[in-house]
């Protein structure tokens, strides 16, 4: 059979209609084979039987029960069925079948087609309609209800198709209705019209069909006309077959044989039926005979009964007369006794009534309590559900937020990386241009004539090289993108594996829960059955009680009647007594004699009657025994039948289960195949990655070609022809590059396809898991069903036993009662003699006692049953509650499982993201290492090139070649490592595959065990053994994955180093290209001269051309003629070939037809032979069959004869047995009569004695009865009292319960009020922070000093020759200022020591205890800290004061010696000393008390906790000094991850300013904690690396830290918009380099990279500063060219602001690369951009640059740029990611982009010398700080609680904006609303337009802006930075608003940066880094307490207040900013 047919069969047999049919009984001969079941349906036998059940009316047609795949019989059965259905609908249901009737022919002929299945569905549908509307419909509907819900729904839909759809079945009952609504009539008429139309169409079609068929018949007859001769002969001859052909004869013979076989069958059936008829008649005759016998017996028994009654009546009358006197006396006494009993019963009734009333009351009370308790329980459940839902929603939102943050981080980081790369290349190109110009000028001055053609070529070649390098870089970036895509693919594969494991675990949990649920359900069912049984028993007892009461009432009435009767008898006796005693005595004697005679006669009769009675009893007992045996046999039969049925069901269920298991196995195999295909697709994707590597190789080849081009350039210097060739080759290269780009696009498309494949793979794996779960659930279900079956069987057997026992007992009781009644009657009759009275007395007494006992028992039972019923009621209630709870728990469980799956998925995605980011960071670090090494080489070569310009350009090209070779080697090594990684991943996947296969095998084994064992236990144990191994394997896989990631990250970092190198090369090539273009122009002039000569030659050639044209015309004519001839010949040849082909085709067709004909003839002959063979076979079989039939008939007759003989013998045997039994009975009767007479005589004598004894006993028992009665009444009264007391106690308990609930509610309200008071306390403690603002005035003074210092430096810089001397003096001054600043800071810290900490309060915040611990140690003197700093590593430094002279000496020595090249090494050593802990694990990260640097050590993992713990230290570190900020940047975000930052401080010029800006924000944030602030200030100032070194940067940093901005209270800061806090970040960013110098290396950076130690990459500066010097004018010109202009701020009058604005324009673009700072921040030393820039800060390597040292503008990155430095940089906190980089470019204006900064800085230097003195200090300051702000903005992207947030991207765009806006605000002395500065960069919008929220919040920003304007540079910086800074510090910001730890600063929360990862992610609420105050406030960080809202207003007020208050003091900052400029200039 076809596969599709089997599928159709399965679908059909699983349809609801077939499942309904199965309820009528198993079909398919009990087997579960789909085909046999289906054929059984198609044959129509089973369906006809169903129809017979529905419609039992007799039908004339017989069904063929043995179809044997006979089409005709099948059709016959189906037609009978359809006819029956049709008649039933019309006659019984009054309905008309309108739908097309099932096509019986189609079903009969081709039952296995899809159409025939549809027709059978029609049949089943019509049968269903009959069943649902027939008389037995309730029974059928009950069966339907027992089916599954899904099948029920399907059956209901089918029923509606029949009953409701008038198009299928039309209801005719409306005809009988008298009134029909017009709407219904209208609908009916419409449907009728439609049916009419359809019938007419069908009639027309049928007529057409008839016409066609008749035409066909006529045609066929015409084709074979019967010849007249043959016909006549046929008529005449008796054999008409003679005219037929041999084939027709054979056919007819076969048909004849078939009809004979049928005839035989029919005859056989007839014979069977006749035999059955004879048998039944015989049985009827026997039954008639038996009936007659029974009737006769019945008549005889009736006659006997009548005679017995007559005798009894006579006897009774005689006995009554004789014994009346004695009986009356006895009755009197008995009545008296019964009277006492009546009283007792009345009392008992009253007691029972009272008990009932009490019970009803208690029941009502308990029900009330129950309802109340249930209501409470329901409320609790609802609240729990709501709570869980809210928690899940919260969790989902948090997950979404985290993912958004991560995504934003990644995007921003990428953005920054790209911008940094762009700026680097621009810087390099500008620098090269500047060098070339300088060299050209020098050459012109020395000797203009010496300028040679070779030099120009050199320049052109260098420019061209630069261009090629740029192109190379773009290609590298595309390759990197493709690599990232391949990494994503691999990660998705890992995700799939993890999801599969988690799914397995969840499925196991679900299975366990299901088993528990099933157990609980079973227990519930057991309890329900028990309760039902108890209820039934209770009802029975109640009915027994009622019957007893009725009996008692009857007895009382009888007794009263007897009493009346006795009274009358007494009166008559008294009257008689008055008559003379003599007469009386005589009468008595006469009566006695007469009585004696009558007694003797009666005794004789009695003995006879007793004998007869005994005989009857025996007969009865025998009959009863027989009846019991028959009943037992019947029961056993029923039981066996039930067991058979049950076993059959079990077998069917097991078979279905096995089929399902097999189907599931097939499905799982299919899924495995799909799995393999998906794995193959993964392999193809890996091949794609290999292709990518091939592209990289092509790229290397291009590099090699570039080298060749350079060589060609050397050779082509003197020839123009060679130049032209070069250009052509260049064009070819460009084309190749375009092709490569196209290839890259194709690869991207392939990557997308791979992603789609991954998605499909995930869906397939999910389906696989679902199927596995369904398999497991099905196996569990089968087990549970088996267990339930076993339990049900046991219960059923127990119930059956109980039932049988009850029936037996019942039968015995009934028989006993009957016997007892009969015996009592007989005894009464016999005792009507003299002894009757005694016997009656005895019997009555016994009855009384029995009834008393029964009554007592029944009352006891009743009470026990009542108690039990109460207990059961309670249990029932409990069970119901439990069931309700169970359902709720199930729902909760489902919800939880869903949540668990969601959480698991999110967790896996988060894990994978983490892994990705770690990989990226490691790759970046490795790339940075490589780049640093290569740059060292390249840098040295550059120096040689610059120094040896005259020696020629050969060396340059050699250097380039060497560099390219090294790059090739590095890329090869990277590829090898990647291949290793891919192989490892392949192995992991293979292991996963093996695990899956092993699990599948285990599942198969479990299925097999299921089939074998029906028990439950073993299978479950096996199924739970496997997950452990899996989990272990997965853990090992995860552990093994870590190192691989690190290697990959190293490789990526190397690649990126290579990319930067290539960019530089491209820049050089571009310069060379420009030179070549100039040479081209020169050559073109020469070409002009040659062209004049060519004109003369052209004239000569014109004459020749004319002659040539004539010749060409002639040749053309000849060619035309030739072509025409050739075309004609071609056409002829084509025609010829066509004809040939046609001919061959015809021949082949002819041959094929001949072959077919031969095949057909052969087949026909074979068929004829088969036919003949079949005919012979048929004849032989028919003969054998007839012989067998004869034998069978003979045997049947024999069998009948034997049966008759057997019956006759049986009858004779029975007669003989009856006679024998009668004789035996007669003998027994005689013997028994004799014995009975003797016994009667004995019993009469005994009875008299017993009577007297019993009377005595009766008296005694009566006395005891009275006593017991009294005791019982007393006990009853006592029980009543106890019951009432119990009820009272319960009521009191309820009252107390209510009281308890009230108290509980009060307690809750008290708790709420307590929390409110705590919040209030927090607010009060916040207010205390405002007192700390006064301390900032000292800081502003220090800033003024630093500004003056800068001015002096600028003046000194004007004279180049005296530069070195001035530099030394300047360093001394700086050191002095630093010492002065240290002293001032110590004084300030001493002042702070005397501040009291804010009042303690009950802190619900987790980190409160940690804060307390941290705050305490800070109160110790700064001197202790000084001692510990020198010896301790950075972590210890944190807790000690690092200002000790020993630590600072090395720095000073370095500062004094500006020319020494060992500077870098010293710095590196210092960093080793302080940063030795970089390698420490997270364990070292715990912040120590009072540690200023603590944030730098924090790790991402601990970020949230540290955010809380680190407040105290953060306060100090931020407020005190730049060094603190640089070292403890992570305070703001527990993990310092601004690599860029460390680098940012490559030049001193910037150091000072950044520190100023940065400190201010810090100050603000931490003002609120005076004690911690003071101590932290001490520690941070002393511990700052700058301070230790004694460099001027430290001094400036400190001076700024006390700027007027510090006066802003921490509250203000918390609420300030980003404008307010960003500057701080900026500042920090600039100063970040100091950190590496001395402060602990930010651990995070080191740990993340896990690579080079701090000193790696440190490179000595060029030996001679003079060689690096450049004139200021030249540098300014260069920078002006490179830096694009940008929008000027509103205050245009300020020149310095203009300069800074110009400088800051580029940064807006470039500043973004905050995070890239990790990678490239190090690469961007400012020395690139500003030749005069001083590298005072330990450039990222941590190398301190001396203040006066010149750094030569250089392509190579200083070691600071090397990857090792990256780690320190990262550590340098979060002040702002973007800052880090900007700071690298020390040019103050461009806080973000180093290049732009340097350019703007150079401009600032030149102008500062002239304008700064006259420029208003504040304005300059304002202009300066804003520019720095840009970088800090980067911090904006981080929320308080988010660990891994860096917002490099925003800073870039916002830095500019921010820089501008503050200027405007300051110029106007009022903020103009949220300027671009405060505006967050919405990464989604990528525009500076303020978002809607920010537009709504101008008020907050305007309030803060004025403060910023007046506050000086720090304040200005704050204007743009407050948000970002706050965000950045949000963990610390919380401390800033110290009094309220729960609600960290709202405004700043918007974007806190935790540099955990390279990827940036903006938190949801705070996602837009620069959002204004209004936006920031509502945003809640995870760690924030919910009481944020109340403080929003206050925070805003504080903002405005702080700004106003701060405006009053003259801000030292205005001067400070120019000072910073001066300082920068001096450094340069």
Swiss-Prot record:
<feature type="coiled-coil region">
    <location>
        <begin position="1045"/>
        <end position="1094"/>
    </location>
</feature>
<feature type="modified residue" description="Phosphoserine">
    <location>
        <position position="1444"/>
    </location>
</feature>
<dbReference type="GO" id="GO:0008017">
    <property type="term" value="F:microtubule binding"/>
</dbReference>
<dbReference type="GO" id="GO:0090090">
    <property type="term" value="P:negative regulation of canonical Wnt signaling pathway"/>
</dbReference>
<feature type="region of interest" description="Disordered">
    <location>
        <begin position="1419"/>
        <end position="1724"/>
    </location>
</feature>
<dbReference type="GO" id="GO:0043296">
    <property type="term" value="C:apical junction complex"/>
</dbReference>
<feature type="compositionally biased region" description="Low complexity">
    <location>
        <begin position="1902"/>
        <end position="1924"/>
    </location>
</feature>
<feature type="compositionally biased region" description="Polar residues">
    <location>
        <begin position="1842"/>
        <end position="1855"/>
    </location>
</feature>
<dbReference type="GO" id="GO:0001965">
    <property type="term" value="F:G-protein alpha-subunit binding"/>
</dbReference>
<keyword id="KW-0950">Spinocerebellar ataxia</keyword>
<dbReference type="GO" id="GO:0044782">
    <property type="term" value="P:cilium organization"/>
</dbReference>
<feature type="compositionally biased region" description="Low complexity">
    <location>
        <begin position="1439"/>
        <end position="1450"/>
    </location>
</feature>
<dbReference type="GO" id="GO:0046330">
    <property type="term" value="P:positive regulation of JNK cascade"/>
</dbReference>
<dbReference type="GO" id="GO:0031122">
    <property type="term" value="P:cytoplasmic microtubule organization"/>
</dbReference>
<feature type="coiled-coil region">
    <location>
        <begin position="456"/>
        <end position="1017"/>
    </location>
</feature>
<feature type="compositionally biased region" description="Polar residues">
    <location>
        <begin position="1589"/>
        <end position="1604"/>
    </location>
</feature>
<keyword id="KW-0963">Cytoplasm</keyword>
<dbReference type="GO" id="GO:1902691">
    <property type="term" value="P:respiratory basal cell differentiation"/>
</dbReference>
<feature type="region of interest" description="DVL1-binding">
    <location>
        <begin position="2026"/>
        <end position="2028"/>
    </location>
</feature>
<dbReference type="GO" id="GO:0042802">
    <property type="term" value="F:identical protein binding"/>
</dbReference>
<dbReference type="GO" id="GO:0001578">
    <property type="term" value="P:microtubule bundle formation"/>
</dbReference>
<dbReference type="GO" id="GO:0030054">
    <property type="term" value="C:cell junction"/>
</dbReference>
<feature type="modified residue" description="Phosphothreonine">
    <location>
        <position position="1954"/>
    </location>
</feature>
<dbReference type="GO" id="GO:0046983">
    <property type="term" value="F:protein dimerization activity"/>
</dbReference>
<comment type="similarity">
    <text>Belongs to the CCDC88 family.</text>
</comment>
<dbReference type="GO" id="GO:0005085">
    <property type="term" value="F:guanyl-nucleotide exchange factor activity"/>
</dbReference>
<dbReference type="GO" id="GO:0031648">
    <property type="term" value="P:protein destabilization"/>
</dbReference>
<feature type="modified residue" description="Phosphoserine">
    <location>
        <position position="239"/>
    </location>
</feature>
<feature type="region of interest" description="Disordered">
    <location>
        <begin position="1736"/>
        <end position="1803"/>
    </location>
</feature>
<keyword id="KW-0523">Neurodegeneration</keyword>
<feature type="compositionally biased region" description="Low complexity">
    <location>
        <begin position="1792"/>
        <end position="1803"/>
    </location>
</feature>
<dbReference type="GO" id="GO:0035567">
    <property type="term" value="P:non-canonical Wnt signaling pathway"/>
</dbReference>
<feature type="modified residue" description="Phosphoserine">
    <location>
        <position position="486"/>
    </location>
</feature>
<feature type="compositionally biased region" description="Polar residues">
    <location>
        <begin position="1011"/>
        <end position="1024"/>
    </location>
</feature>
<dbReference type="GO" id="GO:0003383">
    <property type="term" value="P:apical constriction"/>
</dbReference>
<feature type="modified residue" description="Phosphoserine">
    <location>
        <position position="1601"/>
    </location>
</feature>
<keyword id="KW-0225">Disease variant</keyword>
<feature type="compositionally biased region" description="Basic and acidic residues">
    <location>
        <begin position="1419"/>
        <end position="1428"/>
    </location>
</feature>
<dbReference type="GO" id="GO:0060071">
    <property type="term" value="P:Wnt signaling pathway, planar cell polarity pathway"/>
</dbReference>
<keyword id="KW-0175">Coiled coil</keyword>
<dbReference type="GO" id="GO:0005737">
    <property type="term" value="C:cytoplasm"/>
</dbReference>
<comment type="function">
    <text>Required for activation of guanine nucleotide-binding proteins (G-proteins) during non-canonical Wnt signaling. Binds to ligand-activated Wnt receptor FZD7, displacing DVL1 from the FZD7 receptor and leading to inhibition of canonical Wnt signaling. Acts as a non-receptor guanine nucleotide exchange factor by also binding to guanine nucleotide-binding protein G(i) alpha (Gi-alpha) subunits, leading to their activation.</text>
</comment>
């Amino acid at each position: 059979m076809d596969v599709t047919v089997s599928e159709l069969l399965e679908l059909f047999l699983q349809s609801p209609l077939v499942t309904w049919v199965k309820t009528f009984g198993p079909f398919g001969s009990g087997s579960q084979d789909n085909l046999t079941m289906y054929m059984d349906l198609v044959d129509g036998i089973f369906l006809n039987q169903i129809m017979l059940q529905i419609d039992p009316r007799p039908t004339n047609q017989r069904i063929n029960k043995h179809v044997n795949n006979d089409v005709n019989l099948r059709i016959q059965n189906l037609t009978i069925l359809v006819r029956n259905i049709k008649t039933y609908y019309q006659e019984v249901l009054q309905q008309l079948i309108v739908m097309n009737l099932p096509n019986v022919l189609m079903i009969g002929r081709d039952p296995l087609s899809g159409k025939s299945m549809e027709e059978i569905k029609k049949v089943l549908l019509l049968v269903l309609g009959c069943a649902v509307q027939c008389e037995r419909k309730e029974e059928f509907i009950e069966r339907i209800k027992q089916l599954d819900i899904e099948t029920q729904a399907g059956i209901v839909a089918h029923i509606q198709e029949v009953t409701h759809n008038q198009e299928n079945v039309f209801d005719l009952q409306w005809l009988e209705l008298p009134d029909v609504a017009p709407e219904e009539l209208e609908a009916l008429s419409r449907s009728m019209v439609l049916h009419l139309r359809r019938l007419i169409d069908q009639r027309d079609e049928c007529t057409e069909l008839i016409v066609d068929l008749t035409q066909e018949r006529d045609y066929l007859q015409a084709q074979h006309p019967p010849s007249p001769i043959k016909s006549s002969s046929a008529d005449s001859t008796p054999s008409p077959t003679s005219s037929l052909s041999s084939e027709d004869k054979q056919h007819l013979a076969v048909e004849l044989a078939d009809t004979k076989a049928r005839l035989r069958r029919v005859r056989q059936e007839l014979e069977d039926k006749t035999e059955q008829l004879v048998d039944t008649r015989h049985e009827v005759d026997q039954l008639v005979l038996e009936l007659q016998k029974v009737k006769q017996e019945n008549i005889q028994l009736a006659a006997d009964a009548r005679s017995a009654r007559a005798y009894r009546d006579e006897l009774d009358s005689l006995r009554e007369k004789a014994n009346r006197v004695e009986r009356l006396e006895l009755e009197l006494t008995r009545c008296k006794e019964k009277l006492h009993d009546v009283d007792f019963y009345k009392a008992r009734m009253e007691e029972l009534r009272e008990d009932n009333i009490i019970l009803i009351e208690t029941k009502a009370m308990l029900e009330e309590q129950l309802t109340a308790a249930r209501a409470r329980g329901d409320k609790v459940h609802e609240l729990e559900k709501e709570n869980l839902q809210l928690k899940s929603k919260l969790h989902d939102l948090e997950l979404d937020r985290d993912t958004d943050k991560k995504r934003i981080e990644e995007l921003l980081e990428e953005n920054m990386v790209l911008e940094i790369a762009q700026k680097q290349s621009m810087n390099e190109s500008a620098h090269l241009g500047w060098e070339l110009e300088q060299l050209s000028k020098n050459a012109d001055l020395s000797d203009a004539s010496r300028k040679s053609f070779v030099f120009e070529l050199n320049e052109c070649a260098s420019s061209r090289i630069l261009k090629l390098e740029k192109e190379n870089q773009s290609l590298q970036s595309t390759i990197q993108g493709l690599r990232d895509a391949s990494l994503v693919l691999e990660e998705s594969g890992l995700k799939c594996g993890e999801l599969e494991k988690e799914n397995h675990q969840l499925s196991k949990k679900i299975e366990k829960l299901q088993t528990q649920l099933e157990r609980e359900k079973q227990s519930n069912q057991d309890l329900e059955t028990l309760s039902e049984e108890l209820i039934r028993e209770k009802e029975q007892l109640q009915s027994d009680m009622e019957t007893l009461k009725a009996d008692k009432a009857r007895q009382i009435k009888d007794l009263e009647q007897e009493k009346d009767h006795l009274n009358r008898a007494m009166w008559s006796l008294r009257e008689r007594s008055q008559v003379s005693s003599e007469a009386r005595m005589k009468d008595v004697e006469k009566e006695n004699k007469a009585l004696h005679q009558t007694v003797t006669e009666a005794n004789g009769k009695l003995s006879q009657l007793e004998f007869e009675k005994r005989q009857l009893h025996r007969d009865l007992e025998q009959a009863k025994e027989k009846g019991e045996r028959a009943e037992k046999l019947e029961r056993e039969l029923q039981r066996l039948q039930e067991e058979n049925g049950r076993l059959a069901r079990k077998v069917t269920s097991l078979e279905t289960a096995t089929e399902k298991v097999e189907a599931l196995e097939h499905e799982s195999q299919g899924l495995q195949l799909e799995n393999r295909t998906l794995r193959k697709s993964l392999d193809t994707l890996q091949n794609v990655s290999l292709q990518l590597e091939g592209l990289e190789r092509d790229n290397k080849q291009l590099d090699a070609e570039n080298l060749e081009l350079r060589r060609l350039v050397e050779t082509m210097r003197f020839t123009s022809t060679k130049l032209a060739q070069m250009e052509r080759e260049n064009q070819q290269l460009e084309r190749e590059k375009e092709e490569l780009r196209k290839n890259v696009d194709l690869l991207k498309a392939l990557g997308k396809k791979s992603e789609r494949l991954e998605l499909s793979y995930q869906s397939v794996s999910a389906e696989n898991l679902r199927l596995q779960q369904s398999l497991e659930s099905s196996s569990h279900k089968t087990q549970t069903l088996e267990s339930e079956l076993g339990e049900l069987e046991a219960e059923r057997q127990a119930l059956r036993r109980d039932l049988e026992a009850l029936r037996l007992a019942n039968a015995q009781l009934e028989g006993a009662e009957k016997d007892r009644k009969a015996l009592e009657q007989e005894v009464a009759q016999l005792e009507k003699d003299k002894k009757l009275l005694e016997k009656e007395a005895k019997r009555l007494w016994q009855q009384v006692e029995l009834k008393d006992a029964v009554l007592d028992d029944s009352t006891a039972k009743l009470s026990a049953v009542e108690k039990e019923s109460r207990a059961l009621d309670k249990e029932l209630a409990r069970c119901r509650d439990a069931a309700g709870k169970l359902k709720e728990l199930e729902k909760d469980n489902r919800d939880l499982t869903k949540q668990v799956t969601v959480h698991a998925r999110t967790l896996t995605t988060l894990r994978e993201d983490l892994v990705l980011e770690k990989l990226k960071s490691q790759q970046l670090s490795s790339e940075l290492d490589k780049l640093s090494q290569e740059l060292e080489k390249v840098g040295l070569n550059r120096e040689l090139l610059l120094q040896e310009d005259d020696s020629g350009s050969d060396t340059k090209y050699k250097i380039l070649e060497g560099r390219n070779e090294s790059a090739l080697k590095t890329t090869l090594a990277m590829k090898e490592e990647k291949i290793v990684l891919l192989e490892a991943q392949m192995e992991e996947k293979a292991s996963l595959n093996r695990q899956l296969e092993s699990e599948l095998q285990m599942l198969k084994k479990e299925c097999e065990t299921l089939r074998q064992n029906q028990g439950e236990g073993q299978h479950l144990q096996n199924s739970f053994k496997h997950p452990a191994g899996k989990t272990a394997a997965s853990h090992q896989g995860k552990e093994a994955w870590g190192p691989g990631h690190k290697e990959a990250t190293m490789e990526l970092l190397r690649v990126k180093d290579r990319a930067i190198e290539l960019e530089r090369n491209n820049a050089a090539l571009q310069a060379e290209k420009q030179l070549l273009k100039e040479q081209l122009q020169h050559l073109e002039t020469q070409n002009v001269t040659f062209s004049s000569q060519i004109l003369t030659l052209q004239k000569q050639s014109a004459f020749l051309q004319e002659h040539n044209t004539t010749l060409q015309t002639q040749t053309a004519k000849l060619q035309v003629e030739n072509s025409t001839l050739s075309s004609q010949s071609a056409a002829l040849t084509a025609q010829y070939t066509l004809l040939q082909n046609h001919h061959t085709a015809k021949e082949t067709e002819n041959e094929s037809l001949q072959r077919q004909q031969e095949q057909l003839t052969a087949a026909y002959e074979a068929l004829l032979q088969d036919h003949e063979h079949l005919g012979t076979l048929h004849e032989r079989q028919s003969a054998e069959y007839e012989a067998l039939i004869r034998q069978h008939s003979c045997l049947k007759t024999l069998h009948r004869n034997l049966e008759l003989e057997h019956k006759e013998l049986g009858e004779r045997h029975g007669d003989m047995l009856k006679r024998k039994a009668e004789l035996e009975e007669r003998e027994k009767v005689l013997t028994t009569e004799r014995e009975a007479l003797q016994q009667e005589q004995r019993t009469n004598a005994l009875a008299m004695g017993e009577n007297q004894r019993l009377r005595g006993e009766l008296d005694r028992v009566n006395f005891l009865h009275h006593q017991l009665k009294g005791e019982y009444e007393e006990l009853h009264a006592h029980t009543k009292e106890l019951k009432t007391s119990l009820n009272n106690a319960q009521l009191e308990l309820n009252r107390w319960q209510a009281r308890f609930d009230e108290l509980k509610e009060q307690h809750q309200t008290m708790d709420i009020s307590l929390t409110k008071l705590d919040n209030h306390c927090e607010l009060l403690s916040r207010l205390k922070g405002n007192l700390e603002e006064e301390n900032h005035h000292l800081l502003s003074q220090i800033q003024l000093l630093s500004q003056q210092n800068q001015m002096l430096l600028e003046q000194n810089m004007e004279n180049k020759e005296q530069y070195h001397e001035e530099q030394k003096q300047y360093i001394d001054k700086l050191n002095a200022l630093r010492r002065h600043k240290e002293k001032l800071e110590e004084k300030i810290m001493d002042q702070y020591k005397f501040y009291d900490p804010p009042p303690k309060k009950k802190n619900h915040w987790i980190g409160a205890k940690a804060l307390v611990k941290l705050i305490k140690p800070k109160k110790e003197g700064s001197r202790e800290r000084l001692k510990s700093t020198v010896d301790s590593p950075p972590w210890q430094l944190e807790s000690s004061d690092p200002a000790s002279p020993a630590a600072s000496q090395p720095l000073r020595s370095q500062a004094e010696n500006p020319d020494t090249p060992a500077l870098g090494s010293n710095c590196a050593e210092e960093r080793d000393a302080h940063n030795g802990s970089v390698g420490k694990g997270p364990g070292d990260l715990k912040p120590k008390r009072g540690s200023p640097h603590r944030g730098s050590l924090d790790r991402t993992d601990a970020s949230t906790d540290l955010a809380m713990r680190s407040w105290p230290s953060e306060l100090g570190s931020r407020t005190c000094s730049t060094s603190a900020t640089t070292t403890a940047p992570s305070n703001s975000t527990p993990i310092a991850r601004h690599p860029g930052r460390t680098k940012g401080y490559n030049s001193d010029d910037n150091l000072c300013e950044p520190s100023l800006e940065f400190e201010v924000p810090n100050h603000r944030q931490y003002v609120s904690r005076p004690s911690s602030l003071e101590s932290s200030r001490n520690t941070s100032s002393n511990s700052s690396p700058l301070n230790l070194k004694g460099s001027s940067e430290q001094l400036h940093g400190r001076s700024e830290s006390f700027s007027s901005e510090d006066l802003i209270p921490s509250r203000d800061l918390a609420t300030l918009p980003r404008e307010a806090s960003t500057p701080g970040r900026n500042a920090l960013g600039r100063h970040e380099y100091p950190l590496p110098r001395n402060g602990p290396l930010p651990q995070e950076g080191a740990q993340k990279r896990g690579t080079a130690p701090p000193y790696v990459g440190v490179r000595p500066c060029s030996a001679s500063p003079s060689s690096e010097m450049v004139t200021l004018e030249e540098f300014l010109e260069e920078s002006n060219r490179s830096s694009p202009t940008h929008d000027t701020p509103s205050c245009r009058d300020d020149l310095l602001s203009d300069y800074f604005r110009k400088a800051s324009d580029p940064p807006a673009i470039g500043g973004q690369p905050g995070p890239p700072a990790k990678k490239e921040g190090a690469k961007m030393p400012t020395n690139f951009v500003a030749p005069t820039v001083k590298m005072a800060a330990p450039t990222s390597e941590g190398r301190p640059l001396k203040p006066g040292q010149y750094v030569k503008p250089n392509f190579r990155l200083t070691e600071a740029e090397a990857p090792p430095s990256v780690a320190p940089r990262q550590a340098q906190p979060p002040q702002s990611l973007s800052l880090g980089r900007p700071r690298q470019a020390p040019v103050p204006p461009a806080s973000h982009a180093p290049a732009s900064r340097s350019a703007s800085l150079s401009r600032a230097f030149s102008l500062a010398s002239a304008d700064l003195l006259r420029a208003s200090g504040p304005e300059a300051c304002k202009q300066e700080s804003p520019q720095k702000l840009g970088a800090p903005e980067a911090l904006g992207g981080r929320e308080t609680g988010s660990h891994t947030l860096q917002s490099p991207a925003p800073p870039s765009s916002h830095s500019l904006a921010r820089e501008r806006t503050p200027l405007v605000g300051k110029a106007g002395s009022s903020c103009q609303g949220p300027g671009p500065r405060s505006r967050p960069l919405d990464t989604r919008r990528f525009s500076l337009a303020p978002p809607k929220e920010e537009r709504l919040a101008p008020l907050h920003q305007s309030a803060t802006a004025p403060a910023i304007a007046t506050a000086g540079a720090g304040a200005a910086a704050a204007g743009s930075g407050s948000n970002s800074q706050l965000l950045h510090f949000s963990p610390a910001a919380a401390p800033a608003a110290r009094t309220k730890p729960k609600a960290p600063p709202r405004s700043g929360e918007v974007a806190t940066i935790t540099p955990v990862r390279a990827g940036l992610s903006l938190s949801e609420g705070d996602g837009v880094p620069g959002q204004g105050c209004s936006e920031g406030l509502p945003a809640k960080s995870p760690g924030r307490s919910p009481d944020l809202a109340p403080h929003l207003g206050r925070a805003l007020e504080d903002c405005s207040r702080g700004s106003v208050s701060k405006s009053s003091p003259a801000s030292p900052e205005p001067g400070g900013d120019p000072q910073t400029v001066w300082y920068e200039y001096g450094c340069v």
